[in-house]
Amino acid sequence: AYLSNSLVDRSKIRLQRLPYVEKVEVNNAPVAGTPDLVDVDFDIEYRMPGQFSGGVGYSESQKIMLNGSIVHTNFLGTGNRVALQLNSGRYQKLYSLSHSDPYRTMDGVRRTVSVNYRDITQFTSAASDFSTTSAGGTVDYGYPISEYQTLSFGLTYQHSELLSSTNSTQQAQDWVANNGNPFIENVGNGAVFFGTEFDTFELIAGWTFDSRNRAIFANRGTRQQFFLSYAIPGSDVQFYQARYSFTKYIPLWSNKWTLRVNSELGIGEALGDTTALPPYKQFYGGGPQSVRGFKESYLGPRDSFGRPYGGNVLVASQVDLILPLPVKWASQARSSLFYDIGNVFNTGEVTFTDKLGAPLEYKPD
């Protein structure tokens, strides 16, 4: 076949996008005795496919915190990804395990299976007395439809129990009293808990466009994702949630600097007899994953105690100027200057008032 430089470059990028590959170099070597033939050699430098992290911390609110995670992107040399995460503190316990096979079929169909358990006594370290316990699992398939695009479909099952007390916020007490299967639990000494238990079956669908030149530490290309989840009829609570993210990497000044632009939008609404999104489905703003410089999960609506409660609409955007590092560290770490903007809203609380604060009413002629 004729040598196509564009196809060779594309093969190089495909290899670079593997999470366990650090660098790829291409060499065209002439075949001895045949001046019209060349051998295309790919020199691949691998990165460590396994990542392990763990820590012990202490805070005034959470007390002793234990956390650990194991991620292996080339498990037993199969190319499969296995991830285990453990987090345990005074107010939250999170455990999850997932397995992803990127080539479940010869056509490149991906399958991901995951299970999770969480027990969260408080939404944030400053939240009121409110407990969420849930366990569930997800099966998700991804279907490539072009070089850069993938469609995904799956099903999630979640069993949840939410518990509040007379010391909880008004929002928490209202939600458990009006959704799912409410119950009252008397634990003695005059203490009464109000709770609800419910099962949800969520259909999930997504679209991904990814033209980045690397899966880790990309410096050019675009990544877009849109995900939609819908709690189907038959679930004890019904809702939908949609999320869109856009990330663009723009190389600058001889490819030594990179401008990264990221935006994220999210919205969710309760459906049917459900009065509001389940509290654990609310969006939160602030912290390293959304609006840096603000306390984690501290932006947006407040509960009746003036503490973060989350909202059903998320708007956030980040701009990073990624600074050049020595070649030794360029593929292992990044430093950047950033500017973030965003917030979380609750559309159920939107009202229109005049300049004196009086509510406005509009009556058509």
Language model features with spans:
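Gram-negative/organellar outer-membrane beta-barrel architecture
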Residues: 2-218, 222-223, 289-308, 312
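C-terminal transmembrane beta-barrel domains of outer membrane proteins
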Residues: 18, 64, 69-71, 81-101, ...
